[in-house]
Amino acid sequence: MTSRFSLLFSLFCALCFAFSACEREDNPHILWGNGTPPALPTPQPQPSPQPSPNNPSPNPALPLNAQQRADAARLEMPQLTGENGELFIVHRVANPQGRDSIVNYAYAYLPQSYHSRWVAFRFDAQTRSKVVGRKPYDAKPQYPRDPKLPTAWAIPSDLPFGRVYDHGHLVASADRLFSREANDQTFYMGNMSPQLSSFNQKYWTGLESLVQDLGRNRSFADTLYVVKGGTLAPLSSFGYAANGKMPVPHHYFMALLKVKNGVYSSIGFWVEHKNYGKIGVPREMGKHAVSISALEKLTGINFFHNLPDAVERRVEQTLTLSSWSL
């Protein structure tokens, strides 16, 4: 009797263990290299949509230090949200005059997408000059891991995007030619987006050339503020690159704000990511133009929010193509 009871008890324990083993799921981790990534940064609450121009904090809930808060208050910076573990990354370069370092460009990075939400920079007296050329093609790595991103949430150096996608610069190499360091920083993987080769090398360059020509034209603008990016929402992207980690945007956008003699004006561009079968011509880019107000609705991004509210409303609702050589 005792042996029969022991046998039944053993069978019961074995079944319980089997069921518990079947119900347990491993928590998958994305591994770059040999380490296990840390938890995503804790999402922060949504900020108020219109910060006071007298206190242009991007989001008081974001854990920004004093320097980051100052950088986030620059006119080119869209509003930070703190959602989905958003990271605010700023790349600076040495000032050839030996003064404070120069902000080269910045971006809001979404770790779960391994892609930036937007990149932002400006053409001004310090950054519009053309002193150097493109980073040499034989330089290795050609596309380094961004050293400012946590290793676990950064795309590794030179990771291929697949046969049909290029490493598409968001801040173009030709946007940053004022120093060797500034140009080299545009090749960081954090500045890359998977773009169709025909789009990256032909059509998109038409819009990039327009922006570069305007940004370097002192008679056009004292400062040209630029924001670029691609759509990342699941319904706004098609497929993934970088070993299935990085969404391929369905659209790319640009938001431009210029100031000349204290007068502001703006324009947005909304461009479908596809093979256009031709080289983009700068003067034809007007077909993709939209107001900043419309672009904000398309992207969910609050552009140029550091302007005084009255100026922001006027500038973002007005679109005059002739003011942009279109």
Language model regions located:
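Domain-level detector for secreted/extracellular nuclease and nuclease-toxin modules, and
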Residues: 22-326
